[in-house]
């Protein structure tokens, strides 16, 4: 990801919150295999684990955390991961595997949009030296992936049980807002028949990514002058759409942050 200084976000807690607010990541792996493509990507919702002890919180900028997810075994990417584990098990007795090469997980923000040059109310009439662009936000995580796919292993069962419960809880409460009280109560995994859940668990694999680097980008017209940014905000607000209002809000927030530096 191209990171101009004006667009880059390096504050780890903010990037972690971005992931929690936008947990659907795109996992990309590069696994050499005679049976599957080298490069594969899948959309996977992730749970982010970050240190929660006082000592670790003080070092949160140095501790990006861990991402947990699961993939259907029928997914070709999962099959490549299982193939790699099988080759590893031929040499060891381990029921899990951390791949030696990095993987990449990309998280996109909730709003992105084309930006017309007509929004730039200072530069366009003054010089005409403006071109279209696209505003968006994203966070990418690099790290080492561990695969849990031996359905007979107790370690795999425990990982998957925790994963599906934590993911459902986060999605129901933080994303849907089903917190009880005046709001609806959340759906829980225990609401479904236990044998049904156990059957589904046999058809998924678990993945855990130990994050080694987090990078964030908010490309929201910060590179433009104040007058042009004001035009961008007005232009998106006049669209009268949810996406337009979201972009306008972020352009203002990011512009204010730039001006304060």
Swiss-Prot record:
It comes from the Eukaryota. InterPro entries: Split_barrel_FMN-bd, TR_PAI2-type. It comes from Aspergillus fumigatus (strain ATCC MYA-4609 / CBS 101355 / FGSC A1100 / Af293). Signal peptide: none annotated. This is Uncharacterized protein AFUA_5G13800. Transmembrane segments: none annotated. Belongs to the PaiB family.
């Amino acid at each position: 990801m191209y990171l101009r200084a004006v667009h880059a976000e390096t504050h780890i807690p903010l990037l972690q919150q971005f992931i929690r607010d936008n947990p659907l990541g795109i996992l990309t792996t590069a696994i050499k295999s005679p049976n599957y493509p080298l490069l594969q990507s899948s959309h996977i919702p992730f749970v982010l684990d970050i240190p929660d002890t006082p000592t670790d919180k003080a070092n949160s900028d140095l501790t990006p955390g861990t991402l947990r997810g699961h993939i259907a075994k029928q997914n070709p990417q999962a099959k490549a991961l299982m193939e790699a584990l099988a080759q590893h098990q031929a040499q060891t007795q381990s029921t899990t595997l951390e791949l030696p090469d990095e993987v990449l997980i990309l998280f996109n923000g909730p709003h992105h949009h084309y930006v017309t040059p007509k929004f730039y109310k200072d530069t366009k009439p003054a010089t005409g030296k403006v071109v279209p662009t696209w505003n968006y936000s994203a966070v990418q995580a690099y790290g080492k992936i561990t695969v849990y796919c031996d359905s007979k292993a107790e370690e795999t069962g425990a990982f998957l049980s925790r994963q599906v419960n934590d993911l459902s809880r986060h999605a129901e409460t933080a994303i849907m807002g089903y917190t009880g009280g005046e709001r609806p109560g959340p759906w829980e995994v225990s609401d479904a028949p236990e044998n049904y859940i156990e059957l589904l668990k046999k058809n998924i694999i678990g993945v855990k990514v130990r994050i080694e680097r987090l990078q964030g980008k908010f490309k929201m017209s910060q590179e433009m002058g104040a007058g042009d940014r004001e035009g961008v905000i007005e232009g998106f607000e006049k669209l009268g759409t949810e996406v337009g209002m979201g972009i306008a809000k972020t352009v203002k927030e990011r512009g204010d942050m730039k001006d304060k530096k």
